[in-house]
Design a protein with these regions (language model features):
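A short, N-terminal "cap"/entry segment at the start of jelly-roll beta-barrel domains
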Residues: 1-29, 42, 111-129
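Short histidine-centered beta-strand/loop micro-motifs
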Residues: 20-23, 33, 41-46, 64, ...
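Short, charged/polar surface micro-motifs in flexible loops or helix N-caps
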Residues: 26-28, 37-40, 57-61, 104-108
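A generic "binding-loop/recognition-motif" signal
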Residues: 28, 37, 48, 68, ...
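Short, conserved beta-strand element in jelly-roll/cupin
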Residues: 34-36, 45-62
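Short acidic-glycine-tyrosine-enriched beta hairpin
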Residues: 66-82
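Ligand-binding loop in jelly-roll beta-barrel domains
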Residues: 82-108
Length: 129
């Protein structure tokens, strides 16, 4: 199939994996995520990648450069420009479900990380080569 066509809200709400790549193009990538209560992605920076986040369920705290904080809820979006240190923390009572668009792509096509531990292990292996 060329591109991605689907109900992204339903796909996001159905997803229970920490990270799942739905589509990878030459210049952008669509990813769904699910963070457990209290879970966070960890402070990170992508020097060459812009990110768009859309919250579909739950509440999240976005922290930029370890000081600027924004609490967002279902239906809200956040843009994280390349070069911005950021963290996303699930501050709600249940699962945080979101989708994000990376531009350019950030993960290998078809990536599925069932848990944060799986994602951390894959990152470690990727950076050790």
């Amino acid at each position: 199939m060329t591109g991605y066509v689907g109900n992204i809200e339903k796909q996001t709400l159905k997803n229970n994996y920490f990270r799942q790549v739905l589509f990878t193009g030459e210049k952008a990538q669509l990813v769904v995520m699910c963070l457990q209560r209290g879970e966070e992605i960890g402070n990170e920076v992508h020097h060459e990648v812009d990110q768009f986040f859309r919250i579909e369920q739950g509440e999240a705290k976005f922290i930029f450069h370890q000081k600027e904080e924004h609490v967002v809820h279902d239906g809200e979006a956040v843009m994280v420009p390349a070069g911005t240190f950021h963290n996303v923390i699930n501050t709600g009572r249940g699962k945080l479900k979101l989708y994000k668009i990376y531009s350019p792509p950030n993960h290998p096509d078809g990536t599925v990380h069932k848990s944060k531990a799986d994602a951390d292990k894959a990152e470690e292996e990727h950076h050790s080569h």
